[in-house]
Amino acid sequence: MKKSPLPVQNVQSSDKNVAGKEALVKLLRWHFGHADFRGKQLEAIQAVVSGRDCFCLMPTGGGKSICYQIPALAKPGIVLVVSPLIALMENQVMALKEKGIAAEYLSSTQATHVKNKIHEDLDSGKPSVRLLYVTPELIATKGFMLKLRKLHSRGLLNLIAIDEAHCISSWGHDFRPSYRQLSTLRDSLADVPVLALTATAAPKVQKDVIDSLNLRNPLVLKSSFNRPNIFYEVRYKDLLDNAYTDLGNLLKSCGNICAIIYCLERTTCDDLSVHLSSIGISSAAYHAGLNSKMRSTVLDDWLSSKKQIIVATVAFGMGIDKKDVRMVCHFNIPKSMESFYQESGRAGRDQLPSRSVLYYGVDDRKKMEYLLRNSENKKSSSSKKPTSDFEQIVTYCEGSGCRRKKILESFGEEFPVQQCKKTCDACKHPNQVAHCLEELMTTASRRHNSSRIFITSSNNKTNEGQYSEFWNRNEDGSNSNEEISDSDDATEAANSVTGPKLSKKLGLDEKLVLLEQAEEKYYERNKQVKKSEKNAISEALRDSSKQRLLDALTRVLQLLACVEEIDSQKGSEFLENECYRKYSKAGKSFYYSQIASTVRWLGTASRDELMTRLSSVVSLAREQEPLEEPLLATEPVENIEEEDDGKTNTVESRVDEPTQELVVSPILSPIRLPQVPSFSEFVNRRKIKQNTLIDKSSEGFDDKKPAKIMKLQ
């Protein structure tokens, strides 16, 4: 029910009393139902209401939105809120409207008539909207900036609040170039106070945000980063028999809780979700590889508690306000302490006891290092996130000290270990953690012939030639196809064969010689390091790929309600054979990438697309249907005689034995094609054939026939 605006009017009756604590608390209780302000909320509100710039650093769940929602009620006019995500704007506007507060948002997803209605209200003599949420991209447009200037000239723009302000800094873990353009707000709207809010910002990020926004003598407020209601724990994959099983047992032991599981790769999200569902845990995968309709369904099911667990890439979570999340699990190591803190902080927003669990694996660490190094090489000029930031989270996992202390120290906050009060595994079970670290050291030394497992030992090339498909924030934002970073071996192979730039002036024979030499050099180098064996596609890999496709196809068939029309087993075998035929000679990396691409295609395919691609399997299933009915007869067959060229073959069935059900399945014998010769083999065979023909022609043919044969050849 819409609340009466009387308390707001009473507060506005006296400008002197607008920033008073009593009036502000009255607004808080009336509109939001809270007894009092928390942390630095009151100081931030009083600063911006009095017209002063403010930089406010509050932990996730600390109530940052109150800092600009109360000022919108305390004074007439409009508060402009800049938000990075449309989902965040939608959620907050919906919540405010339910409380009777006039709020709107402008985005590209809205219908034209809705946007026109909002613009008409802004142009009216007395706009009804109190909070207007916009994206940084909209502010960058000339038309909207002109509208803001008009509102300002009419005295209707009270405050500019920039949520998730760390996005403006290239030092931050969530840098967005569009945020960088917000510095123009100070030039155009000089006397409007600016409130910058963030939950995660290291000291260098804080300074960068303040400088970039041109904040003038801002009040800098920093709440403690400590989340005392969260228990921090690290589990070591290298010491577990099966990380999937361990996670499943952990979730079962916690009961029917709401949780988020973050994964580095989309395929891991799919596989882990299937595993959890198979053991009776209600879960769903969420990532940009799914179409928008499926993502929306999964999100709604999780928010409404129809789904217990959501397994997602790290793009998920910003702007999602679900207070009863009891556990956040990182199934792969995050890229920085900032990322880990923000993501784990999505647990326990209701201040009730919650849990953060990080599954640490040496191989996962190597993958993340590989990703960060590639990112630095590609974006050395714009990206300021060196691998040194990654060292903090590695130390968090590989160190034996208090986890909470390491988190807070990374943000420049001193924290006595005694205050942890056994709210992390290192303080609660120090001997057990120390034993695990010793065992991890031994295991890593045995596997990698090195006694060092810290990041400084990562410069070796142990992960070369491995396939990987890393999550990319930009790709998730644009819903584009995911890139697969193929192995260095595959790239080298392509460069080796196609490396020589063949001039058009060269003759055919010279080009053939150059290509032949390049190929021989490549294959000779491969023989030396045995890369050909390393890159071979084993039967075990094919079996695991079939199982992966089977799981994905089964899930999609259930969603599309076409289980009866397509045999999931035969469909998965068909798709795997398709990938194997195309990429068996290219090697394991290309083959596995194609399998991953097929799994992602299954997640986005429509019913018609699925039926078209698997048409042979569908038609095969339909052909088999009429054959199955007669075979279910239970009457025994006595004697069947067949005559063939005068010979009688008798097929007897014993009446006293139970009749076995006959199953007729088409024999799909694989078509064995001749092996494709390499380029060198092809050239050599060609020369041998030419020499043979010349020898034969010299025995009994005249001089013209060899030339004719060669011409035909």
From Swiss-Prot:
Residues 696-706 have a biased composition (Basic and acidic residues). GO terms for molecular function: 3'-5' DNA helicase activity; ATP binding; ATP hydrolysis activity; DNA/DNA annealing activity; four-way junction helicase activity; helicase activity; metal ion binding. It catalyses: Couples ATP hydrolysis with the unwinding of duplex DNA by translocating in the 3'-5' direction; ATP + H2O = ADP + phosphate + H(+). Transmembrane segments: none annotated. It is found in: Nucleus. It comes from the Eukaryota. InterPro entries: DEAD/DEAH_box_helicase_dom, DNA_helicase_ATP-dep_RecQ, Helicase_ATP-bd, Helicase_C-like, P-loop_NTPase, RecQ_Zn-bd. The keyword Metal-binding applies. Residues 246-391 form the Helicase C-terminal domain. Belongs to the helicase family. RecQ subfamily. 3'-5' DNA helicase that may play a role in the repair of DNA. Exhibits an ATP or dATP-dependent DNA-helicase activity. Cannot use GTP/dGTP, CTP/dCTP or UTP/dUTP as nucleotide cofactors. Catalyzes DNA strand annealing. On nicked Holliday junctions, unwinds the lagging strand. Cannot act on intact Holliday junctions. Does not unwind G-quadruplex DNA. This is ATP-dependent DNA helicase Q-like 3.
